[in-house]
């Protein structure tokens, strides 16, 4: 069965936009088309910002877009000047290839840490969220698809073997000893067996 590709829903919900607009006391009624137009404008803005940031990321030969890439993009593009205050505290870009967190070849890739995540004793994994906190059913399905696809898409790199052979520790085999209880079995109450015999006779007759 082929793995189904996740469809990304990059739409900003107009109903949520309308609620945000109505939190302002000066805004009265809102026409139905207004939140839809704002939603589309947000999509186009993000598309533009991310394309420019992607170009910056690729120019640095990095595999992961970071906040430093976004900061450089915002500083280079005049149309994003209004965002400069937001990225003022973000550290500047370092030299080419010096950023360890940008190069995928340096260091192990993000994978599951042994013992820190995943399901233990039937518990939720680290990506599991409380259904009350999650927004809609489609978001919950998307989250479950994320957890399914994470295992397929990402394969952690195996670190290179050291020059020393791995040490194998063996303990001497222990002889098989059947488990026997050392506690004495309490005797049955003396009056309990006699009524049972009488009840069985009643059922037979």
From Swiss-Prot:
Stretches assigned to the Histone-fold domain: 14-77
Annotated SUPFAM superfamilies: Histone-fold
Region Disordered, annotated ranges: 91-205
Main location class: nucleus
Keyword annotations: DNA-binding, Nucleus, Phosphoprotein, Repressor, Transcription, Transcription regulation
Tree of life domain: Eukaryota
Biased amino acid composition, Acidic residues: 138-155, 196-205
Record function comment: The association of the DR1/DRAP1 heterodimer with TBP results in a functional repression of both activated and basal transcription of class II genes. This interaction precludes the formation of a transcription-competent complex by inhibiting the association of TFIIA and/or TFIIB with TBP. Can bind to DNA on its own.
Family, as annotated: Belongs to the NC2 alpha/DRAP1 family.
Protein name: Dr1-associated corepressor
Source organism per UniProt: Bos taurus
Lineage: Eukaryota, Metazoa, Chordata, Craniata, Vertebrata
Gene: DRAP1
């Amino acid at each position: 069965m082929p793995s189904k590709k996740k469809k990304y829903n990059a739409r900003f919900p107009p109903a949520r936009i309308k609620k945000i607009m109505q939190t302002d006391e000066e805004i009265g009624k809102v026409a139905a088309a207004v939140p839809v137009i704002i939603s589309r404008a947000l999509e186009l803005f993000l598309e533009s910002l991310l394309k420019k940031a992607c170009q910056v990321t690729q120019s640095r030969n990095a595999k992961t877009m970071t906040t430093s890439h976004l900061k450089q993009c915002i500083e280079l593009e005049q149309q994003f000047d209004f965002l400069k205050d937001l990225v003022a505290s973000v550290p500047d870009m370092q030299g080419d290839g010096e950023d360890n967190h940008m190069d995928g070849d340096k260091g192990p890739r993000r994978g599951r840490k042994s013992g820190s995540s995943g399901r233990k004793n039937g518990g939720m994994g680290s990506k599991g969220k409380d259904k009350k906190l999650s927004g809609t059913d489609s978001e919950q399905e998307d989250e479950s698809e994320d957890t399914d696809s994470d295992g397929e898409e990402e394969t952690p790199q195996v670190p290179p073997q050291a020059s020393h052979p791995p040490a194998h520790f063996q303990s001497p085999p222990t002889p098989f000893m059947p488990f026997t209880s050392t506690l004495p079995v309490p005797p049955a109450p003396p009056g309990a067996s006699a009524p049972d015999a009488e009840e069985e006779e009643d059922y037979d007759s």
